[in-house]
């Protein structure tokens, strides 16, 4: 499998595209006017404790207060007190060091934790933890033992917090890992110095910019190229790589081609498709994605694909294709939270298991943690996917001003009948002789064409003259009834 990363940099935003076998798999966008908060550390102030929710609202200097749940308190502190009551840990006015682990979303504030974690290329340092762990993606038993021994040795010698070896640490020499952990300790010391003098509600530390985080978090062995179209960003990445990851330097390229870097693999076209509700499958079937406040639903349909004579085999093949497409779309659209998938009903238990196993296999490529909880009695696949940043739709779109975010508009006929009722109401109340109706082009056209006979009858019934004026700036649901 060939893999590469494209980085597109402009003053307003940075975009990173992960390409696998020539196909866009993941897209991350960071805008200068709205940089993500995940990883940022603040000195917050408790403004409200909610015992009923076992949570607290923390003021960290943002427009909306952030949310801290009991389960997100430092594990060391929880073990020490052993209480399940938030009031035993926090009180109003208390100053507390917190880190954002989930960006604000919609009307919800940021989610916080007091279990601070600082990532590097190979490890994650947790200053308030005693634990040592190894990424689950490292499967070799001997390598897991080696890494754990290395981390525990360093922890014991330096009497510091806990560490987790990241996937990139696999097969890396102990000396390199030790140097990486030394760097993390020095970084934490500089953060502690800032904490000591910081005022409440003050920002303490922020994570690296997206372009540099790409090297730290997205690069792995097998990625052939990292192409960046900004000379300044290219030099910054090379400088970072020379210090922290020398093996990456040869794969970083400054892209100077005539066409935009995202046009190499038609990223812009794929981006437009990722915002669509319907996703076509190669077989002729399609997926339908619907996002709500509480969950995302995915419906699988055969569409025009009828296959051969065996209907069950046709459904099975469509579901297999859908399993791969859904896993890709969840990653590309960055959909998180509760996700319900309605695969096409299959009679055979073996086919059901094969589709579920294929889906789980495709999900393994995703960096975000996901969990398939169960298949419901109705045959729906229920799963969760960890959400730390906004979905693609939330970043790039806003609710439709015409429909108010419903996704549908009243038909022109419905609006016409609504106008008739409004006219009757106004005439009976104010006894007018003339009325002017302002409406959209579509509605005005229908009133003067298909509804012309009804209009004539209404004028005779009410003994009133009704005039119309088409307003090009009105959406289909907009109209005004003006008394003359």
Q: Which stretches of residues belong to each language-model region?
A:
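Charged, low-complexity intrinsically disordered tails
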Residues: 132-241, 246-268, 275, 389-484
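Phosphate-interacting basic helix/loop segments used at nucleotide- and nucleic-acid interfaces
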Residues: 29, 33-52, 82-104, 145-154, ...
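Metal-dependent catalytic core segments for phosphate chemistry
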Residues: 70, 239-269, 273-277, 282-320
